[in-house]
Amino acid sequence: MKNIFLSAILCLTILTAFCQQPAKPDTAYNPKNNDTIRIGNILIIKKNKRAKKDTTMIVLKDTVTPKKYSRVSTNYGVFDFGFSNFIDRTNYTAAGSYIVNKPGAPAFNEADMKLRGGKSININIWFFMQKLQLVKNHVNLKYGLGVELNNYHFRSPISFKENGTIPYSGGLQTNAPFVFRDSVQFSKNKLAADYFTIPLMLNFTTAKQTGKPGFSASFGVSGGYLYSQRNKQESTERGKQKNKGDYDMQRFKFSYIGELGVSPVRLYGSYTPNSIFEKGLNIRPYTVGVRFSNW
């Protein structure tokens, strides 16, 4: 027991002596110039002058590296809400077999293609958009990837068919798509066209830095690929119907696009100068709406 007690006292004495040793300061001493002391990033220079009191000058070295901003910024989950419509340039007298007319009834015409403006909705969901600085932050290249969802609600009871029995023909069949004036009244009658789309725009902004408030304007083009087309209808006689098929719509869509406003809310618009149908109808869509985006 005595040996254990003595050993404990010896260890405590050695530990106390070690703790009392003065810590070595983070200093650098220059014997040739003993009026200068460096402590980390602080340089202390002491100069003796003829004045009664010594003068001490402290020089602080700034080691902070300026932050480098990336020329590319990314915005995820951009959302558009607006309205779809189109300009009808169809020559109905030369539409051919795509339009089926009922014998004894007025011919299918432009009035049959009129839309319900308040219900024809355009929703765009951009998975991401990127902005590449070209001239400081005031001129940028904007591009991205997303989906365009267009819904055209018709006033008249028209129907689109991929193929099948031709109405009012006595049972004749066709493998070609067609549109006709139906015999029932629909409470809901829309043609939906959905696209994968890549926009490319030149952006001009007054904001000095990405994410800061400022006026912004962008103009450019977009390319879309049609991945879904369907005619959705509701009526008392037939109930709910969703007819998916190929209605002879163009697979690819080229559009002029633009946006205007102040972050995070701005206006957007698009116009397709060519028909979205391969033949028969000459329909040129346009959209307008509000975009919710960080920049």
Where are these regions (language model features)?
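Cleavable N-terminal export/targeting peptides
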Residues: M1-P66
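Detector for outer-membrane/organellar transmembrane beta-barrel domains
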Residues: N189-A207, K212-L226
